[in-house]
């Protein structure tokens, strides 16, 4: 809406308000629909004709748009009437929230979308994306090396296997939030559970259901005792990490061991299952040996950086982490340094064994990832390590985690 001297708005109250014309500014609060701040010179409006400032009698001024006919949520609007010598201008500012008309079907669809969005946020999207990319790239590499073994049923089995792995991932993320509610009210008050967007009962359902479904899928796929054991190990690791009386997360060493078991188990199980599905025997290829070593050392950075944004809550509830002991800045420098050493080792590997890897891809990709890490660490330092910036930095480490598996496809 643009305020002007002529308006077709219908008014819910008396449209004429008596305003004293003196040397004082007058603020009249009203309601209006959305408009950016506008300044209307009253000399161009028939409703605010200029008068001599010596005239101190009350004039009747027609204020427009007190109650406009619009489908919107109404927000306060301020009118400021200036004195005549200053041009009798009116400054209006307004904010609204759209409220479009919704049919029953549209409203139900919106509710479903909102629920799915909250569920997706609850299972920590950055970890889920990392697991999906990891699984896809490990399986994709085997297909690239053995294209003659491709078949549609094989892809279907691979998708079911990925869903099983995601089940353990969702369980680990969910069980941690359920038992960290008090801490998260301080560290992450915007999470779906502590913010009240989902109930505790719903959280338990979203946590246990994926784990059970994943276990059923593992059995249905006839994955064998090894993969079934690895799945159970992932569930066990997520449990002892978060659930009392274990709460391994309260000690930085045991927390690292849990995270290492989860990531190492994921890496090995997907590779083993991929080769088994293709009818190939398990073998430690140079590329898989490299990605296993790289991800193992990268887990050090993930484990040390995961609590950067949680320092305040962890200290209050007596949770000892590397971040609470050493501080956000020192942990960032430590984690960044370890990961940079990892990239240097990757570049050195490409130089030392040029026949085992595609050296050009190894060199260029890891150099780019290393410089991007340095840039993000500098950006974090400039923010003085605020919780929001620390959270973004940790999620960026997960992006680097995923990027390494993409590189693995082509080395």
Curated annotation (Swiss-Prot):
GO molecular function terms listed in the Swiss-Prot or TrEMBL record: prenyltransferase activity
Pathway terms, separated by semicolons: Secondary metabolite biosynthesis
pH effect summary: Optimum pH is 7.0.
Distribution of this protein across tissues and organs: Expressed in glandular trichomes called lupulin glands, and in early stage and mature cones. Detected in leaves, but not in root, stem and first stage of flowers. No expression in male flowers.
Cofactor(s) annotated in UniProt: Mg(2+)
Transmembrane portions of the chain: 159-179, 198-218, 226-246, 253-273, 278-298, 333-353, 356-376, 391-411
Transit peptide start and end: 1-91
Cofactor mode of binding and number, as noted: Cannot be substituted by Mn(2+) or Zn(2+).
Enzyme Commission no: 2.5.1.136
Primary enzyme class: transferase
Subcellular locations according to the entry: Plastid; Plastid, Chloroplast membrane
Keywords associated with the record: Chloroplast, Membrane, Plastid, Transferase, Transit peptide, Transmembrane, Transmembrane helix
Annotated membrane topology: Multi-pass membrane protein
CDD domains, alphabetized: PT_UbiA_HPT1
Superkingdom per UniProt: Eukaryota
GO cellular component, as recorded: chloroplast membrane
Family per record: Belongs to the UbiA prenyltransferase family.
Function: Involved in the biosynthesis of prenylated phenolics natural products which contribute to the bitter taste of beer and display broad biological activities. Catalyzes the first prenylation step in the beta-bitter acid pathway. Abble to transfer dimethylallyl diphosphate (DMAPP) or geranyl diphosphate (GPP) to phlorisovalerophenone (PIVP), phlorisobutrylphenone (PIMP) and naringenin chalcone. Can also use phlorisobutyrophenone (PIBP) and phlormethylbutanophenone (PMBP) as substrates, but not 6'-O-methylated chalcone or naringenin.
Name used for this protein in its record: 2-acylphloroglucinol 4-prenyltransferase, chloroplastic
Organism this protein belongs to: Humulus lupulus
